[in-house]
């Protein structure tokens, strides 16, 4: 369900890329409820996303709060690692491939999630397109003079990912990070890599 049905402002990816964005988070953590549809197959769960100095740890949980997969992104060496903890390993890998396609898309979609467009306000929703993706941002949660969307929806062909932000936090230094109880970025040594 959407927060507000006013017509969103349409922003091109080129304009978005050229923005000087005060909401460009270097260190950010958020938790969210997610709904994913791939064709007619649906999945609900939770997402816990921690980003610190260009490294992200994304934990995907099922509706019962059991971890099914962890994704690790590192912008410094353009690496993506996936630790699949589910019994349905092959199915989850296929779904992730369908959603993202390649590594470049993963990092661009991460930017689209972590850095909302400057046009997004409490009164103005935004719609942005990148390649085959349409990204809708609705509502904002404001903290420390920064905003983060309440709701993000990504659509591509027969894939829809809805992200309902529960809470988010940004911080400036390691001390603040540790006080908030967020874990350090540590990608496991033995991990499945399958996106090129």
Predicted regions mapped to residue ranges:
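N-terminal leader/targeting segments and the immediate start of mature chains
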Residues: 1-46, 187-196
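Non-transmembrane domains of secretory- and envelope-associated proteins
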Residues: 3-8, 81-86, 130-196
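Short small/polar-residue motifs
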Residues: 12-17, 43-46, 66-69, 117-118, ...
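Short glycine/serine/proline-enriched coil/turn segments at secondary-structure junctions
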Residues: 37-41, 65, 144
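An acidic-aromatic
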Residues: 53-107
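Extended, positively charged loop/linker patches that create polyanion-binding surfaces
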Residues: 94-137
């Amino acid at each position: 369900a959407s927060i507000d049905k006013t017509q969103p402002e349409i922003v091109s990816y080129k304009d978005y890329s050229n923005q000087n964005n005060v909401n460009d988070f270097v260190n950010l953590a958020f938790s969210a409820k997610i709904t994913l549809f791939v064709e007619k197959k649906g999945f609900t769960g939770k997402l816990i996303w921690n980003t610190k100095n260009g490294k992200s740890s994304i934990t995907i949980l099922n509706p019962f709060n059991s971890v099914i997969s962890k994704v690790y992104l590192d912008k410094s060496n353009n690496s993506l690692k996936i630790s699949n903890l589910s019994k349905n390993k092959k199915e989850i890998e296929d779904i992730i491939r369908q959603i993202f396609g390649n590594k470049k898309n993963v990092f661009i979609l991460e930017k689209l999630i972590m850095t909302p467009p400057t046009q997004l306000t409490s009164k103005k929703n935004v719609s942005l397109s990148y390649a085959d993706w349409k990204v809708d941002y609705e509502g904002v949660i404001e903290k420390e003079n920064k905003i983060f969307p309440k709701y993000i929806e990504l659509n591509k062909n027969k894939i829809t990912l809805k992200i309902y932000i529960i809470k988010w936090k940004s911080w400036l230094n390691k001390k603040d990070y540790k006080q908030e109880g967020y874990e350090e970025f540590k990608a496991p040594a033995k991990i499945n890599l399958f996106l090129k």
